[in-house]
Amino acid sequence: MSAIARAAARVRQQNTTPLQRPLLLQRKPVLTHTLPLHASPLKPSLATSITSPNFQQSFQRRWASASAKAEEGAKEEVWPQRKLPELTETDKLRLRRQRNVGISAHIDSGKTTLTERVLYYTGRIRDIHEVRGRDAVGAKMDSMELEREKGITIQSAATFADWVAPKPPTELKEGETVGNTDKQKFAINIIDTPGHVDFTIEVERALRVLDGAVLVLCAVSGVQSQTITVDRQMRRYNVPRLAFINKMDRAGSNPFRVIGQLRGKLKMNAAAVQVPIGSESDFAGVVDIVRMKAIYNEGVKGNQIVETDEIPESVRALAEEKRAELIEQLSEADETLCDLFLDEAPITPTDIAQALQRATTSLRFTPVFMGSAIKNTGVQPLLDGVCAYLPNPSEVQNQAMDATLPAHAPTIPLVPATDAPLVGLAFKLEEGRYGQLTYMRVYQGELKRGSMIYNARTGKRVKVPRLVRMHADEMEDVDAVVAGEICAMFGVECSSGDTFTDGSSTYTMTSMFVPEPVISLSIRPEGNETPNFSRALNRFQKEDPTFRVHVDSESQETIISGMGELHLDIYVERMKREYNVACVTGKPRVAFRETITEAAKFNYTHKKQSGGSGQFGRVIGSIEPMETDPDTGKDTAFENRIIGGNIPNQFIPAIQKGFQEALDRGLITGHPITGCKFVLDDGSAHAVDSNELAFRLAAIGAFREAFNKARPVVLEPVMTVEIVAPIEFQGNVIGAINQRKGTIVDTEVRDDEFTLTAEVALNDMFGYSSQLRGMTQGKGEFSMEYKNHQPVLPNIQKEMAEAFRKKQLSK
């Protein structure tokens, strides 16, 4: 490195903002939602123990939902001081060998195939079975019959396994080198998640409770639409991740192009920690460029790992080049390594490995592994990487809130100590053979079979009759589960996102983000309605927060809503298979919305006199556009600015209720209203005639009066569509997207195929699957995910408004 380059690097480091500096310099708590999407939220340095005196100054508010404004308010108020529990030596030893990991990716990247190999190499299953049930068995984690038929994961599945790996880099003692220590046994909880966007809630709730993740990418397709969604979800919950480039044996595989996409499309500081030996069909193994060793899988199923210092000459230059690149990229994320790099000091494999662990845990860096799960290559080194670089439960600072304090009160750090008061989060519900199965992450304390626990939301005290650890659809009964573990309970009635305690605290945890449905359709049984029809709908609603059911007030039809056509099709099929209820469905309906584009004032009086006590309520204020809150997902709000009491306090909730009722049905097309804030400034009441009904109706009338003055528009869901097809069909594919009024965002050509990314209204995408198959001779495929709601064209809005008006007049 030249003197000029060294000087420039030092200046760059000095001029870096706090959010860009390596983590060891950054000690302030950071709220995740204050960061832009492309910036990695921070976590505290591993140098800060969860039990150290400096912990309260350095902890990251991982699950805090309060805003930065709330922090300012907290300085002016005095909050109760709490003595944090302390980890015992037994706790520390147990937690150092614990990992909670999710496996996520775009559909068909090989997540379930990878998980199957992980289970085989860790000894959890005796043989390897393939996705789609080609061998009449199917992958272990795809336990549902529909999953094996369609070859996709529909529900997330949990399991646990033990893996023997070298000691993590941060635990190395004087004289020890990375990878050459006595091996330790690690306990790994694994959740395999769906890759299809329609089942995104499964990814959402898995990442909510995990400490780390493996982001799987296809060596050919690279970063795809759902990869971007999964990355966004990982950032939302501050989940450190490793990347695994799978399918290295496929024709056209190019791992370094994929790493370029990680940096470009995901704004991720990523670099390879391995390089491939051979390519495509000649892919034979990898070179670990941290330790500069060649690694091969031998044996029929890749059981035997062979490590050697003899790196093939064909890849030696590449390995040295990528090692230099790794050190340079990693130096931007870790100050210790940066100093060695700038001083041109010798950098050992241990220096690199320790920097990787610090930078990965702090969300500053993503190590990239590579292999081929289907060819049983590169999976064991990935498991070693999970144990070496991803955090254990004591290195992730989770937060709870005290339900007895205001929402802006400081959050309480949870310590994964066994003897601490119990705090756990129910993150997934499932109807099992023996009743409701509730998946739980224990954050603090110990959960015992037969113990009494409290639901923080309902206040109810319930008994835990049975406690199990899950292995896909199999269960292993246990007597107790301690902090840092994932388990399941039978016979406990609750909802997804509920917090459970032992009753000694009033703690509650924030739930997971639940996206709004984008598509609906009517549904009815083929014959007479049976109890099973309602039973199935109730169960599916309870299990899946993105699956909604309501009865249309006009047609009296039962309407189901979800994240896409496949999402709803799966539930219709499950009703037939699991409840013996064949259903007839109507044409899919798009989830249109209405909103306002500017603020409008109202001064509305509701007055009714018909003898005796009447109704009187006057409200003054405004409605204004509102952006979606990135933390809660809410895009409507009610704000009371009344000072003095012109409207008695007991009537304020009625006004808020009236506002919520008015949102249910828009005035242009009858669709729900979104993106709107109701501000109450003033009003008046009558000593006799004012009541809750009067103010509720006044709020509805005021909202409707102001809505028409606020330049309302109709919104429609717009999807990000990604199409992959042979290059000879590019013109036809682009023409079809233009025909559907789509906006082309990006095109990429590689070898003999191309990828097109476009934004198209969901209402214009019906029937596209058949059209694409026809125009590409069955060789094209596409995926789409919800992007946002955007205004429809003015002429479309006019047609929709006219149709709605005629429908109203015909009643």
Curated annotation (Swiss-Prot):
Pfam families: EFG_C (PF00679), EFG_III (PF14492), EFG_IV (PF03764), GTP_EFTU (PF00009), GTP_EFTU_D2 (PF03144)
Residues the record lists as binding GTP: 105-112, 192-196, 246-249
Signal peptide boundaries: none
GO biological process, one term: mitochondrial translational elongation
Transit peptide: 1-64
Keyword Cell inner membrane recorded: no
Cited InterPro entries: EFG_II, EFG_III, EFG_III/V, EFG_IV, EFG_V, EFG_V-like, EFTu-like_2, G_TR_CS
Pathway the protein acts in: Protein biosynthesis; polypeptide chain elongation
Sorted UniProt keywords: Elongation factor, GTP-binding, Mitochondrion, Nucleotide-binding, Protein biosynthesis, Transit peptide
GO molecular function: GTP binding; GTPase activity; translation elongation factor activity
UniProt xrefs under CDD domains: EF-G, EFG_III, EFG_mtEFG1_IV, mtEFG1_C, mtEFG1_II_like
Location(s) in or outside the cell: Mitochondrion
Domain of life: Eukaryota
All copies of domain tr-type G, residue ranges: 96-394
GO annotation, cellular component aspect: mitochondrion
Annotated function: Mitochondrial GTPase that catalyzes the GTP-dependent ribosomal translocation step during translation elongation. During this step, the ribosome changes from the pre-translocational (PRE) to the post-translocational (POST) state as the newly formed A-site-bound peptidyl-tRNA and P-site-bound deacylated tRNA move to the P and E sites, respectively. Catalyzes the coordinated movement of the two tRNA molecules, the mRNA and conformational changes in the ribosome.
Family: Belongs to the TRAFAC class translation factor GTPase superfamily. Classic translation factor GTPase family. EF-G/EF-2 subfamily.
HAMAP family: EF_G_EF_2_B (MF_00054_B)
Protein name: Elongation factor G, mitochondrial
Protein source organism: Cryptococcus neoformans var. neoformans serotype D (strain B-3501A) (Filobasidiella neoformans)
Taxonomic lineage of the native organism: Eukaryota, Fungi, Dikarya, Basidiomycota, Agaricomycotina
